[in-house]
Regions:
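Second RecA-like catalytic domain
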Residues: 1-4, 52-296
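Conserved segment of the helicase C-terminal RecA-like domain
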Residues: 2, 8-60, 74-78
């Protein structure tokens, strides 16, 4: 049994500068490397080949940073307020989070209307604490109910809560983009989620499971992620129903849908510049991902 360890991994990390959660490729810690090595000796003797030097290994941190020190704390703060656990600064964490991360978490919750200026939870915050999704996504759902487009927002919100089911293999990116283009809609990648959902649901009802898996492969879709999307959608709908949020019976137009989405993305707005990129909050410049239907 062989294990080939490149010594790197994508690690979710919150950027205090850009205020977004990122997935940079980083060198793994010694503990992670040793865990990978252990996989080659579980059922039989094996060999682990590390694609980095011993000096590199010894220079690495002993353990990976705990997640509470590399994630946005808005959801943690919201649940602590909901459970009345006291000030987050006074809570006896095993690994206390950074003070700036706590401040950023409160800033986001205030932006969403979940807390007031004093840091006390609002009615919106109490509703958000009941939803099994990130506060930004939960805020979209609450506004979707108010705008009369909760049915569509439940689909989009559940898509944002899971890994994108659309795959772009490095050697077949153009073919994948062409396959995914059938669900694109001019002016909105969010509408593409709705089109993909409707397309998958119609195929799911018409095909056997093996035929459905083949359809997914032909269209560069990950079947397991689509199943996770459906399960997350089911959970969101059940929670919304328990909260008394009513789904619209008639399809909603694009305007109320995007108004609802905007409620959770206020700090993610950007203006297109003459150079073709976008200027966002805090003068941050960014580009659309090549897989976006708007990037073409």
């Amino acid at each position: 049994v062989y294990v080939i360890d490149p010594g790197e991994a994508r690690i979710s990390r919150y950027s205090p500068r850009s205020k977004v959660q990122r997935l940079p490729v980083e060198a793994v810690s010694q503990a992670s490397a040793n865990q990978r090595k252990g996989r080659c000796g579980r059922v039989a003797p094996g060999i682990c080949v590390r694609l980095f030097s011993e000096e590199d290994f010894l220079a690495r941190p002993e353990f990976t940073d705990p997640e509470i020190r590399r994630t946005n704390l808005a959801s943690v703060i919201l649940q602590m307020l909901h459970l009345r656990l006291g000030r987050i600064e006074d809570f006896p964490f095993i690994e206390p989070p950074d003070g700036r991360a706590i401040s950023d978490g409160f800033t986001l919750l205030q932006e969403l209307g979940a807390v007031d200026r004093s840091g006390a939870m609002t009615d919106i915050g109490r509703q958000l604490a009941r939803l099994p999704v990130d506060p930004r996504i939960g805020r979209m759902l609450l506004e979707g109910a108010r705008q009369g487009c909760l049915a569509e927002l439940a689909v989009i919100a559940s898509a944002l809560a899971v890994q994108d089911p659309r795959e772009r293999p490095l050697e077949k990116q153009q073919a994948a983009d062409q396959a995914h283009a059938q669900w694109n809609e001019e002016g909105s990648d969010f509408a593409a989620f709705l089109n993909l959902w409707n397309g998958f649901e119609s195929q799911r009802q018409a095909l056997t499971q093996s035929q459905l898996r083949s359809w997914c492969r032909r269209n560069f879709l990950n079947y397991l992620r689509l199943r996770e999307w459906r399960e997350t959608h089911r959970q969101i709908r059940l929670t919304c129903r328990d909260m008394g949020l009513e789904e619209n019976k008639q399809p909603a137009s694009g305007e109320p849908i995007h108004k609802a989405l905007l409620a959770g993305l206020l700090s993610h707005l950007g203006n297109k510049t003459e150079e073709g990129d976008y200027l966002g909050a805090r003068q941050r410049r960014f580009l659309l991902h090549p897989s976006s239907g708007l990037a073409k």
